[in-house]
Structures are given as structure tokens and as C-alpha cells.
């Protein structure tokens, strides 16, 4: 009879992929998954299944397994802990060997870790809560084109949050009227104005016309105020080539900053653009359109802190990060957790802020968090307190909605932010007297 190589049939994942005795290595990429298994599937099996399907595993032994070293390449579920207050959920910790991932590719990282496993039958739901990126891997990325310090030096603006404004109505203005709104806001005292995320190149306003009129607005406002101004020109396009064409044209116009929608545009396009921006001295503003599709459900998808880490590696100088106080969702401690992950070099593990792993970015530049969405001048005390100086505060309707017009709206915001910063520096309690501070300043 023929010799038997191995037993065919379906194998339990936990025999190979659940290894509670494993000591994680400094070079491992660690993931924390929130797992909701189907009824009857034990936690160890579900955790091991996640580790297997997002690394080397398939549902049975294949003879080519003998041609490689499984121990060197397999993902391992090394710890499981129940989620407080949830009966059928637990956190599975998975360690991936560094060699599973292509250097400098967020695309490959995500394809491996979250590519296939989320459709897995044995799981009712799965959410990636956090990733620990080891320096051995993060060092293969360029990261943000410039980072917080270089941006401040380029703009010559220190010691306060930067102010922005999204031009509204976001769709329908002609390029010239759009440029006029940009000029009024910048002239009134804002640092930046912004293309809305869905302003690309539509029939009512083609991208090139918008770029030209906005550049004119920037130059005029700079000449009149003596400050450096910018407008986030949205370079997002249907193809990478078209996106690069727009970024190159922006550079030729001499503007300081361009913008990209990194989730709809994709990580590959974003990383290419970030490299171009560093090589050519452009700042890069990142909008997170589509993030809530991925991060809003509490038990399925990916937490935004993972998308934020991925963006810091892929590259961007600003990224939208919720407001804590405006019209869109976001809890304070958790938001501050990923705001620190964007800005700081070293972030301690702190479960109360949703940070599952200590993250050491070594020398990778930081990203400025952008607070945007339904905020207005009376939120200013809270925003200065929550976000501190290293942030961009964006008031769209909160600038353009001023009954006297765009420029007075911009003046209001600039006066308010400077008053709040000064009051804070003098040791006054913004939470209590913030509104009073603003009223005094506006007299």
C-alpha cells in the first residue's frame, strides 16, 4: 500500500496557532483583535483561526508545508482576555513575524492582517483594535513628508493651534467665487483654507481653474497680512498619474500644501504622494473620508487608531481626528489616545485610552491632528484645552456662517484662539471662564 504522508482532513487551528507560552519578540508586529465567535466556537479556536488566516494558514495540511519552516512564519495567538461587560466577546492578541510583510508597504501590511480574515465563517464579528508597529518595520517607511516642527518652521507660526476653514457650499461654486471665499478667510486671519474632500474636478469647477484662482487668493492674502498662508488643494483623482499631475501643478504655482483623501485614494497612492511632497517641499493634508465605514461599528472593522498609525507610516502632515465636541462621533480619552499616537514619539500602553500596546515611533515625524466638523467659536476654549497647541482647528460653517461675512468670521476665530491661548498661558481656567475670555477679547 502507498505510504501515508500526513492525515488529510480539517484540522483545529488551535493545535498549531494557539501558543499561550510564546514570548513576543521586539521585531514582531502585534495585533489586538476584538473577536465575537459564532455560538459553540471556543475562544482559543477563534483566536487561533484569526492568527492562521491572517498569516500562513489554510484549513488543512498541505504537502508544501514541508518545504518551509512554519514556526518561523506563522502568526500566533499568544493571549486571550474577556471583554468586561460583554458575554461573547474577547480580545485575542496575535504576534506576526516581521518577515511576513513587505518593507515600506502599508498596503501589504493591511492585505495580510485584515485582508481575508474578516469574512471568516467561525466569527460573528471581528475588529482590529490596535497594532504595535516595531521600529524594525516602521524604519522602512518614510512617514510624514515633513512633520510638526518642520511645518511650524515653514509657516513661521508657533505657540498656538493653526486655524483652517473648509470652503462651503462645498459643491457648486465657480472657481473664481471659490477663490474669493479663500481670499476673504485668509485675509481675515486664518492660516489655511481647505477644499472639501469631495471637491476633485467636477463639471462646475475643473481642478486647474480652482488651483489657479486659489493660488492668486493665497498670494494676495500673504501680501496684505505679511503671514504665510495656505489652501489645501485637493489632488485626489481617479488615477495615480492624474493625482501626481495635480500635485506637480500645485508645486509649480508655488503653494505650500496639497491634500489627499487617503482611504478612498488608497494607501499606495497616498505613499507615492507623500514621497513626492517630501522631495518637493509640499506639506500634505490628509482627509479621512470613508473612515466611518471601517471604524464606526464597535465590534466589527478597524478602530481609527489603526488607520491613524497606518497614515503616519504612509505619510501625511495633517490628518482629521474627530473633535470630541462637534457634530461627529468621538470619545474624549480615546480620541486623545490616537491624537498622541499621531503626534508623539513614544506612547505608553494605556487601556483606559484604548492603547493596547506601547508604541515607539523612534524618530518618525509626527502628524498634526485636525479637529473639524460642526465646531464653532464657542468650542474654542474646550478645543484649545483638549488638543493643545499642536493641532489644526477647522471651522467651515463656523467661519462662513458669520452673519457679517467670511472675513469677520475668520477674524472672530483668530481673536478667539489667541485669547484662549493667552488665558491658558496666564493660568486661567478655560473650562470655567472660556466664554468670558472670548467676550472680553471681542470688544
UniProtKB/Swiss-Prot annotation:
Binds 1 Mg(2+) ion per subunit. Gene3D superfamilies: Ribulose bisphosphate carboxylase, large subunit, C-terminal domain, RuBisCO large subunit, N-terminal domain. The modification N6-carboxylysine is found at residue 194. InterPro entries: RuBisCO (IPR033966), RuBisCo_large_chain_AS (IPR020878), RuBisCO_lsu_C (IPR000685), RuBisCO_lsu_C_sf (IPR036376), RuBisCO_lsu_fd_N (IPR017443), RuBisCO_lsu_N_sf (IPR036422), RuBisCO_lsuI (IPR020888). The modification N6,N6,N6-trimethyllysine is found at residue 7. The disulfide bond which can form in the large chain dimeric partners within the hexadecamer appears to be associated with oxidative stress and protein turnover. Its cofactor is Mg(2+). GO terms for molecular function: magnesium ion binding; monooxygenase activity; ribulose-bisphosphate carboxylase activity. It catalyses: 2 (2R)-3-phosphoglycerate + 2 H(+) = D-ribulose 1,5-bisphosphate + CO2 + H2O; D-ribulose 1,5-bisphosphate + O2 = 2-phosphoglycolate + (2R)-3-phosphoglycerate + 2 H(+). Mg(2+) binds at residues 194, 196-197. The keyword Chloroplast applies. Its EC number is 4.1.1.39. One of its GO terms (cellular component) is chloroplast. The active site is at 168 (proton acceptor), 287 (proton acceptor). GO terms for biological process: photorespiration; reductive pentose-phosphate cycle. RuBisCO catalyzes two reactions: the carboxylation of D-ribulose 1,5-bisphosphate, the primary event in carbon dioxide fixation, as well as the oxidative fragmentation of the pentose substrate in the photorespiration process. Both reactions occur simultaneously and in competition at the same active site. Belongs to the RuBisCO large chain family. Type I subfamily. Heterohexadecamer of 8 large chains and 8 small chains; disulfide-linked. The disulfide link is formed within the large subunit homodimers. This is Ribulose bisphosphate carboxylase large chain.
Amino acid at each position: 500500500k502507498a505510504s501515508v504522508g500526513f492525515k488529510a482532513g480539517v484540522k483545529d487551528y488551535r493545535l498549531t496557532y494557539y501558543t499561550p507560552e510564546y514570548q513576543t519578540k521586539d521585531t514582531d508586529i502585534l495585533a489586538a483583535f476584538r473577536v465575537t465567535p459564532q455560538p459553540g466556537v471556543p475562544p482559543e479556536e477563534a483566536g487561533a483561526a484569526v492568527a492562521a488566516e491572517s498569516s500562513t494558514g489554510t484549513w488543512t495540511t498541505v504537502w508544501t508545508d514541508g518545504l518551509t519552516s512554519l514556526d518561523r512564519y506563522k502568526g500566533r495567538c499568544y493571549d486571550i482576555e474577556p471583554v468586561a461587560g460583554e458575554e461573547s466577546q474577547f480580545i485575542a492578541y496575535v504576534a506576526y513575524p516581521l518577515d511576513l510583510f513587505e518593507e515600506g508597504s502599508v498596503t501589504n501590511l493591511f492585505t495580510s492582517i485584515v485582508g481575508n480574515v474578516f469574512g471568516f465563517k467561525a466569527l460573528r464579528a471581528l475588529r482590529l483594535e490596535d497594532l504595535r508597529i516595531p521600529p524594525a518595520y516602521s524604519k522602512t517607511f518614510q512617514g510624514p513628508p515633513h512633520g510638526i516642527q518642520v511645518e511650524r518652521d515653514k509657516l513661521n507660526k508657533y505657540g498656538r493651534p493653526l486655524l483652517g476653514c473648509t470652503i462651503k457650499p462645498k459643491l457648486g461654486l465657480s472657481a473664481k467665487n471659490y477663490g474669493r471665499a479663500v481670499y476673504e478667510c485668509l485675509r481675515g486671519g486664518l492660516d489655511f483654507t481647505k477644499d472639501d474632500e469631495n471637491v476633485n474636478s467636477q463639471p462646475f469647477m475643473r481642478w486647474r481653474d480652482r488651483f489657479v484662482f486659489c493660488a492668486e487668493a493665497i498670494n494676495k492674502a500673504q501680501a496684505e497680512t505679511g503671514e504665510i498662508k495656505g489652501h489645501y488643494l485637493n489632488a485626489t483623482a481617479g488615477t495615480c498619474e492624474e493625482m501626481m499631475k495635480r500635485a506637480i501643478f500645485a508645486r509649480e504655482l508655488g503653494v505650500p500644501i496639497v491634500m489627499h483623501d487617503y482611504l478612498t485614494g488608497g494607501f499606495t497612492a497616498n505613499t507615492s504622494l507623500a514621497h513626492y511632497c517630501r522631495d518637493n517641499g509640499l506639506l500634505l493634508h490628509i482627509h479621512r473620508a470613508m473612515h466611518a465605514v471601517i471604524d464606526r461599528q464597535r465590534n466589527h472593522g478597524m478602530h481609527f487608531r489603526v488607520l491613524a498609525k497606518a497614515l503616519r507610516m504612509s505619510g501625511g502632515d495633517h490628518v482629521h481626528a474627530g473633535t470630541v465636541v462637534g457634530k461627529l462621533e468621538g470619545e474624549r480619552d480615546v480620541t486623545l489616545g490616537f491624537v498622541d499616537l499621531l503626534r508623539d514619539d513614544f506612547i505608553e500602553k494605556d487601556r483606559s485610552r484604548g492603547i493596547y500596546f506601547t508604541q515607539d515611533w523612534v524618530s518618525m515625524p509626527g502628524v498634526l491632528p485636525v479637529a473639524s466638523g460642526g465646531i464653532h467659536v464657542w468650542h474654542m476654549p474646550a478645543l484649545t484645552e483638549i488638543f493643545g497647541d499642536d493641532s489644526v482647528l477647522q471651522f467651515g460653517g463656523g467661519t462662513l456662517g458669520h452673519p457679517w461675512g467670511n472675513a469677520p468670521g475668520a477674524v472672530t476665530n483668530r481673536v478667539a484662539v489667541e485669547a484662549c491661548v493667552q488665558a491658558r498661558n496666564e493660568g486661567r481656567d478655560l473650562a470655567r471662564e472660556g466664554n468670558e475670555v472670548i467676550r472680553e477679547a471681542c470688544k
